[in-house]
Amino acid sequence: MALSPKPMTVVRAEVEGKVNWLVVGHTGVIGHDRILISMSKSHYTNQGIKDSKRLSVNLVSREILPKADYVGSVSGATVNKSEVFAYHIGENGTPVIDASPLTMECEVVDIYETEGFDNFICAIVNTYAAPEVLDNNGKLDYTKLKPVLFEFPTYSYLATGEIIGKCLNLDKRPGMCAKEPMSADGIVRLSKIEVYPQYLDEYMKYATEVGEVSLRIE
């Protein structure tokens, strides 16, 4: 699966009146305020999420990785996992892992079923971050957060890497060579772009966040 690795998460849901924790490796971003949690239909936790429409999504650090690995290896149908993590109740009423560097309280807004999977579309209601993973401006610093990544094909845990460059500002060369006109309304966010003359008007119309536009003649 070429889109691995992804951040490893521990999802909490209430099932039959008790807290249950489950590792989820299939996650995604939908827009700026929605996330996707994709879970095999075989999981015990799915019905609890469908019933309550609430869950918490907890990122995993190296410190809590052993416990996360454990809750991902046993089923809540046969093992009571409610006390594996120390937790508190978030503002939206869902348990939040005390030691997680970052947790999102979510509400399920839609569910899409695909073969073998329940796919929960979730709105983020609250986000909690440990002070030690924030920069001086109160923003997330991923060099401090260092979430554990899960690589699905080999079932391996990876560490987050170093920063290798700043987006849209890698060097002085054009960020993109535009050979075709834009076919739909949208935003192109690039530090520089080269455009063939016949497409210049089209790109000037849509590319509102390009730092510098130049003509490509060869």
Spans of model-derived segments:
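Basic, polyanion-binding surface patches
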Residues: 1-218
